[in-house]
């Protein structure tokens, strides 16, 4: 039987020996997205993703679907801190509902993409596969840390500080890969079944 230890976190309780606990701020560097609005959008140019797309129903949170990309002038390319590199995350910093607090996208690829309006970017410090965190960030248990601290009445605000202070549980790298590969395969299987059902309708 696997030996367990207390994580010190209310939302998870015990974790296996060999797993670690850390805060987001020690794993990522935060930055703001571009100060652009709908008025700045054009047909083609520099790809951006803003909070509206992050809250989209087609956003899985674990990759960036092509349909979520919008475009602004290439003049914005000079704002390098707003650029999403491979293994980075983009969180929406506002949400109209409690459930949307913590919504994000994970950038798995090398293609060019910038964070847009109302976006907090997490730049990966180690610059390595963060699929495990992408899946962790989708769980209600993890998001409870964000939701309980988000402020607002009609619109909830999710600040860089709130995200930075959130804790994560970290398995060894090989276990992260096993978890991520398993979930990737399951999600692909579900997507395939969903597509088949839609064809039959």
Tell what function each PLM region has:
Residues 2-38, 165, 169, 173-177, ...:
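Non-catalytic DNA-recognition/assembly elements of restriction-modification systems
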Residues 50, 75-138, 157-159:
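A short beta-sheet element
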